[in-house]
Amino acid sequence: MMGNLQIEVVALEDAWQLLDIYRYYVENTAITFEYETPSLEEFKQRIITILKRYPYLVAKVDGQITGYVYASAFHERAAYDWCVETSIYLKPDCCHQGTGRILYQCLENILRLQHVTNMNACIASPVKPGPYLDDNSIRFHEHMGFQPVDKFHSCGYKFQSWFDMIWMEKMINDHQEKQLPLLRFDEVKKAVFDEKNRYQFKSEVTE
């Protein structure tokens, strides 16, 4: 059961807690294809880079960070501006409690305001059953309304095993002939966050 859940914009002083969460997935799973956990300074720089344009959110339950979610550029070419790649990581003991769903709902609501049209998720998938990866992330994204697009076979090698990569997508805004320009996160932040950078829940986001 979740306690008092709050969604907030990430702060740099949160970075070490987020890095601890990420370290688990680097060292124990194939959910991320990184081999080495980044340094704290590198991790902070990643946060800074993402926040220049996209949302980076943390979930706190009774004041303790339990997970985080963010969007990043799908591709550097200008024509891809309305597409983003999404990433989410939860503390291992905080999965299957609804936190991931609420984080994703908040992220999606913000991306809509930014005029993003496509949310894309790059998800590792096991070639063979094993201890480092399952299909939970795929099922989670299906539950969130994502559809599978394509699979890259045996394209990731980690823990002496090969893993597939599945791309999934969700359309969240109309594709128009005269597309509205993409807005930066800081241009829409005040519409959904209070002065303490806490998400103001609306009726479309339920706990």
What do the PLM-derived regions correspond to, one by one?
Residues C122-A124, I138, E142-S161, N173-D174, ...:
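Conserved catalytic-core motifs of GNAT/GCN5-like acyltransferases
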Residues G3-L5, G63-Y68, F163:
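Glycine-rich phosphate/pyrophosphate-binding loop shared by adenosine-nucleotide-utilizing enzymes
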Residues L19, R23-R46:
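Conserved GNAT-fold acetyl-CoA-binding loop/helix
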Residues S87-H96, I123-K128:
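A short, internal acetyl-CoA/4′-phosphopantetheine-binding micro-motif in the GNAT/acyltransferase core
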Residues Q6-L18:
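A short beta-loop-alpha structural element at the N-terminal edge
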Residues L111-L133:
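Conserved GNAT acetyl-CoA-binding A-motif
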